[in-house]
A protein has these predicted regions:
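N-terminal alpha-helical interaction blocks
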Residues: 1-99
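A gly/proline- and charged-residue-enriched helix-loop-helix capping module
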Residues: 80-124
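Cys/His-rich short segments
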Residues: 107-149
Length: 149
């Protein structure tokens, strides 16, 4: 068996992952969705229905977040009014709503969202940065400085 055939990803293509829970933040608050008697993390489909796929694609944090179930997307959303059923909560409050695994992943996602937000410009020269392909880093387009997550 060749090396390529022996490797299988732990997550499916985006189309298969559209209904999987994601970690979306508006500022420092986590987006949650009331679903009957329980509160849950929204899916890409839940947010795409109200914000549009173009808005979500623009807000997606590169690299996603590793979770117990594989890879999940994280989003840094602009402040908008959400429809009934959605709510915004701090992680401290969400601790009482989410299971331990989701809470831990939400904390990691929050850190990654904040890192991405605060590393859009190089700390060495002040120029814009871009996602460095194949890494969890931002690379300065002017001086080449790498800023790792």
């Amino acid at each position: 068996m060749g090396l390529v055939s022996a490797v299988s990803p732990k997550h499916g293509p985006r189309s298969e992952r559209a209904a999987v829970s994601i970690y979306a933040f508006m500022g420092s608050r986590l987006v949650l969705l009331a679903d009957g008697d329980r509160v849950r993390l929204p899916s890409v489909n839940d947010l795409a229905d109200i914000l549009g796929t173009e808005t979500l694609d623009h807000a997606r944090v590169p690299g996603g977040v590793r979770t117990e179930g594989g890879l999940a997307d994280a989003f840094a959303l602009e402040e908008v009014e959400l429809p009934t059923g959605f709510r915004l909560e701090s992680l401290r409050v969400a601790y009482h709503t989410l299971g331990l695994a989701d809470f831990r992943s939400a904390g990691t996602a929050r850190q990654k969202v904040e890192w991405y937000r605060t590393h859009r410009f190089c700390s060495r020269c002040g120029s814009a940065t871009e996602v460095a392909a194949g890494t969890e880093a931002m690379r300065c387009v002017a001086c080449g400085q790498m800023h790792f997550a």
